[in-house]
Amino acid sequence: YMMNPIFWPVSFDDFKANLNFHTIEDEKLKISDLINIKTKPHGHPNGALSFRVEINDKTFTYITDCEHPESHLNKQLIDLAQNSDILIHDAHFTGSDLLNHKGWGHSSWEQAVKMAKKTNSKELILFHHNPLYNDKQLSHIESTAQQVFEKTISAKQGLVIYL
């Protein structure tokens, strides 16, 4: 879909590499004895997957393009993110902006904070920021989120994450 010429000027025939695609849905993938990945599909207009990556004794969970049900957090994603060392969560909107964007397939920073607390995650990284928010607004969101969940940071260019 994303490689449709309407959205992307390069066709598959232009690639010099052999490309193999695998459909991933609700799965457990063993990459090696040390690396395991679990995936869960969730609400987004064109579908989306969240990932839990376990490396040795460390875990990070990546939840993007996620629209939680209106009255609660997605139960499957709560299960997926349990006890993550790092939770990287869609924080595209503020709670008030989210009300006007139902069906867009995104979360609020408030939902991300609730998810971090509910899953006993050690650290939260807010990302997939709304491009209409400026740096001052994102800094305000980050500091407000830290008042609720202290170990919160906003993703930004150049951020390096260590597990």
Predicted regions, residues:
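Structural beta-sheet core signal
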Residues: 61-62, 126
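Conserved acidic
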Residues: 65
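Binuclear metal-dependent hydrolase catalytic cores
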Residues: 1-61, 69-72, 77-78, 136-163
